Amino acid sequence: MQYRTFGKLDFRPSALGFGAMRLPVLVGPDGKPDFKQIDYPQATAMLRGAIDRGVNYVDTAYMYHEETCEAWVAEALKDGYRERVKVADKMPVWKVEKPGDFDRLLATQLERLQTDCIEFYLLHSLDAAHWKCVVEHGQLAAAEKALADGRIAHLGFSFHGTYDLFEEILAATDLWEFCQIQLNYMDEDYSAGRRGLELAAGKELGVIVMEPIRGGMLARNLPPQVEAVWAEAPVSRTPAEWALQWVWNIPEVSFLLSGMSTMQHVEEDLEYAARSRPGLLVDDELALVARVRDLYRELSPIPCTACRYCMPCPQGVAIPDILALYNDAHMFGDVSRQRFFYTWLDEAERADQCTACGECEDKCPQGIAVSGWMEKAQAFLAG
């Protein structure tokens, strides 16, 4: 296993962190996967196998597997494994609605994890709405109290908003010691992106990368054009490894999280991590990745560059997010996943709120007929 630096902290994390969001589950009475029923034997074997091979960071959250993941982590880390890793957990900031909620939720997490202290604690999934919850309900003050009395050791946040919001959150407090952002070779300019990574690293925060394979989309159902480019590579790598090595190649990345769901995934990711290092990919290989990125973008039906000139929408429609979901569904052929993400948008932000006022179309540098695409996106994504 390779180990890397983590901001200013005296902790060297494994290049690969164990993300516990996509664990193997049992089948319910209806014959469908029951995401609340983690397959304890298989999932535990996966985690312990990863730790035996050097993984030393385990990431969970209050909401994962319908609030059953934290309890599984506690059980899986028995028999001496707890002492060999750091555990990260996350505050569901949207559930904090009144004084005392933060402490109550944290107490529940400590109980589920069977611990007195969570080493790495994140405010979960910060975007504009969730950051508003943090500010309005004094969650930073509550977190500072938890740091002071030892219920948590280090504070960070995971992020799903715009770059400007990322800047604002970083500047809001000196309590941050690390953050978690989405980054992969398709998303250099999305959300916090590469700029956010460099900004946070410049402030000596540890930076964890999530979604390095875009939820698996960069590793499966590859278009023939993409397969042909990978076949040209002088070094043979799977599409998943290309995606992971692209992230590990960046010196500012502390480590990445992989949401592994089978023992095969664990074995493969451990193998990839063992040969990872910053600067591993040479210029010709990075150019190959760029060609793949360009091919995927050519497959997207809407020429949106996520410049966000269309925002804010007078009706509150999340225009760039909706266009991205529509494009992703067509680029990667994973329609059900994008429809699921569409449900995460507030109803007031969805495409059916568009009134075709045309204000966004006047601002769009690409000349996109946004109102027409909103109608198509609503019909397609609302399913």
Give names to the regions the model predicted.
Residues 49, 53, 112-113, 150, ...:
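Structural motif
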Residues 57-63, 153-157, 180-181, 255-257:
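Short catalytic-loop micro-motif centered on adjacent basic/acidic residues
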